[in-house]
Amino acid sequence: MNRTHNNGELRITDVNKKVELIGWVAKKRNLGALVFVDLRDRHGITQVIFDESFNEQLKDVKNEYILDIKGTVVERSSKNPDMPTGDIEIQAEEVKIVNKAATTPMIIADETDALEETRMKYRYLDLRRPALQKNIIRRAKIVRAIHEYLDSEEFVEIETPYLNKSTPEGARDFLVPSRVHNGSFYALPQSPQLFKQLLMVAGFERYYQIARCFRDEDLRADRQPEFTQVDVEMSFMNTDQVIGIGEGLIKKVMKDVMNIDVQLPFPRMTWHDAMETYGIDKPDTRFDLKLVNLNETVKDVDFVVFKSALEAGGHVKGLNVKGEADNYSRKKIDALTELAKKYKAKGLAWLKVTDKGVSGPIAKFFTEEQMSALLEKMNAEVGDLLLFVSDTHYMVVCDALAAIRNHLGKELKLYDPRQFNFLWVGDFPMFEYSEEDGRYYAMHHPFTRPKDSDLDKIDTDPANCLADAYDIVLNGFELGGGSQRIYEEELQDRAFKALGFTQERIDAQFGWFVDAFRYGAPPHAGFALGLDRFAMLLCGCDSLRDVIAFPKNTSATCPMSKAPTPVDNDQLKDLGIEVTEYESEENK
């Protein structure tokens, strides 16, 4: 076995060369006097032609057999412009069957009819598909570019522990029982947050890590229980400088991996402006469908739904879907209404602007003057479809209209899927209040520093305290985020207290961390980028599973290995663990 070339390498300039190729049979066509085989490896496909002298040797060969072929490169009489190797083929002179293959449970091609569960069960076969291999290879190129950039900026790559102390705030931890310390548990890291801050206290100044993280939470298309993030921290740098590092990193990745020169600096937007304009803090700015605040415009309209919301201190917002009045039937509008209801809206009001006037169920509630003011406010013209959501809760209005906006953007093809729009969103609220729990939660995490102008608000006005935090958004996805960090013991204590932590809880869960601030902790900041999500977006995929070699399914299980599985009682006994039947409150 002495492979001379891969299966995506040979060109017309290689005609008459003697070569040896090895690969999987992607397709076999027996024409009697001639047999054609498409030989595949991760680099591509090369067509091999066998004369009838090979018929006996090839009679049992089928897809996914591995062949070692020696032969001569010849020019194809019928060229294939869709293949890089389409100008040539190999005239076989010798063939060896390296290994046989059973009939596969799925078609191994970019277009496969296999169900998701089958693809996951036979992931090693699914990974043979060229499209999936390209994704995994592109992901590797992203990682290489990240290393090159951060190394060039004098960041030090440092590994942090996987076996950590559990700090149950936010998502649930994956727990690891200790055999040596029965009854005690480690937690797998949800992020390296505390350790990377301690590395700043230690004086490393610039740290990074391609970090594996674990969160025991419900899955969706862009979530996995174990995921990878690009984790970066630095000392003595202001927010603009930190953002500059993030932009430089992304520019390097986009150039090296996609051959795209992104323009710096990226646009910036405050959290408040993002919510007002797009209804979401991770807006897709590839299309220009914006929310319109109508509180003042409709305050005197005699429509009880609007009136009751506004009288209760609520909000009314609208969307102008330009030129779509005739294209949206009542059935299609009802579908948008159901989408709004998924986000807790009570309904969706609408109007159509026609050459005969304004029509729709709520048109009768407007006076001529009020309707004129509405049309002017929404920049409405003949042919436009106007959509409205009102509610006493600001976030309900925003969430519902943001979901409708994103749905319309995709349905109406309002953006170029090949376009990449980056955006920084900043000035986040430091805290968000849970009416259900009667307490504040950190919008990012408890170690985020308030803006210098809002330091006093931690204690006196937490609802209006702004964080010195920033998220990077790409095409409507939160790609990552970061912040300046608290580095003073006293300020960190105040932040914990604002979150309702008792001193006992602070000492028990975070005392070991906060104690480091007593020894000259430097001002520091950082960010993390979701590597899986970045790869998903650069590969044009809809699911993280398409850019992770061995992902979990939506039940957080691995159909291939069957993980998680029960373990032997002897193993549990060593750990001091006894498993009992548990019935959740939901199932009682």
What is the role of each PLM region?
Residues 1-588:
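Class II aminoacyl-tRNA synthetase catalytic cores and aaRS-like
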